[in-house]
Amino acid sequence: MKKALIIGTRSSPLALWQAEFIKAELSKHYPSLDISLRHIKTTGDKILDAPLAKIGDKGLFTREIEHVMLRNEIDLAVHSLKDLPTETPEGLVITAITEREDNRDVLISKGKYTLKTLPQGAIVATSSLRRRSQLLHLRPDLEVIDMRGNLNTRFKRFEEGDAEAMLLAFAGVHRLEFSEHIAEIISFDDILPAVGQGALGIETRIDDEETRELLKVLNHAETELCTKCERSLLRTLEGGCQIPIGAHARIENGTFHFATYVGSIDGKRAIKKSLSRENVTTVEEAEQIGIEVADAARAAGANEILCEIRTDNA
């Protein structure tokens, strides 16, 4: 067995929390293993003065880490699964997907407002086109502004700025202990999360069989099924992280449920599709559901919406 592992990670507080969490989980199973972290800056970390959709589509928070791994300088990388493009670079593989945290979005608001009680014309901050689209679909009267940066930075800017509220992922808010600021945990009926939201994806070299074997203990089978369904939809629609697509797969009482949202950035056009199926037990079956729902969304006009957005962001 390997005596040491080097984990590659971004250096934001949330990324470090996630890497330390994986380090601790591995240490429980392999107490003699020497595990260290290597901090790596990504494009998304370096360019902070532009909306994410304007600086690129795929791999903004992963590409540099993957390059370091391909040079054999780290053994594995811990990513927010929602940041991982659906096409993995040649030579790399997602070896484990951890059990998913609550993957709903949350509303942080200065007056403890909810989505429905926010004052007309209130300013809401988010860095996500997906959240912007779904929020404006629900509340076209609101003004949505872009806010980037790590969670600590966003909370500071929010407190000092004009926004009445901001939208974030529950998982990050909870992991960094900002939960007391949550005004509302948003229902899936109102806003669907990003593909893979709430789960961690652990990436390795495909030929590093020893590391891949060590990581098997961290894979959560149900989360793997659900997130691979979501990622299959995203791959079929040829969407990236900065496209307004929401998706949520879950297994309830033995039934696999999947829903998606594709919308224009202003929320005026929205396509919602869902599918439920019994006895989904393999990754292939889950991925097929993603393809079928993507095809249904395409038939309803999703391609036209996404092509317009890609053209605008080019």
UniProtKB/Swiss-Prot annotation:
Its keywords, alphabetically, are: Chlorophyll biosynthesis, Porphyrin biosynthesis, Transferase
Name the chemical reaction catalysed here: 4 porphobilinogen + H2O = hydroxymethylbilane + 4 NH4(+)
Any single Gene Ontology cellular-component annotation: cytoplasm
Spell out which residues are annotated as carrying S-(dipyrrolylmethanemethyl)cysteine: C241
Q: Which GO molecular function annotations are given, in alphabetical order?
A: hydroxymethylbilane synthase activity
Q: What is one process in the GO biological process aspect for this record? A: chlorophyll biosynthetic process
Cofactor binding note of this UniProt entry: Binds 1 dipyrromethane group covalently.
Q: Which Pfam families match?
A: Porphobil_deam, Porphobil_deamC
Q: What positions belong to coiled-coil segments?
A: none
The pathway it acts in is:
Porphyrin-containing compound metabolism; protoporphyrin-IX biosynthesis; coproporphyrinogen-III from 5-aminolevulinate: step 2/4; Porphyrin-containing compound metabolism; chlorophyll biosynthesis
What EC number(s) are associated with this protein in UniProt?
2.5.1.61
Name the cofactor(s): dipyrromethane
Quaternary structure per UniProt?
Answer: Monomer.
The entry's function note states: Tetrapolymerization of the monopyrrole PBG into the hydroxymethylbilane pre-uroporphyrinogen in several discrete steps.
NCBIfam families found in the cross-reference section = hemC (TIGR00212)
HAMAP family in UniProt: Porphobil_deam
Q: Can you tell me which family this protein belongs to? A: Belongs to the HMBS family.
Q: What else is known?
A: The porphobilinogen subunits are added to the dipyrromethane group.
Q: What is this protein called?
A: Porphobilinogen deaminase
Which organism encodes this protein? Chloroherpeton thalassium (strain ATCC 35110 / GB-78)
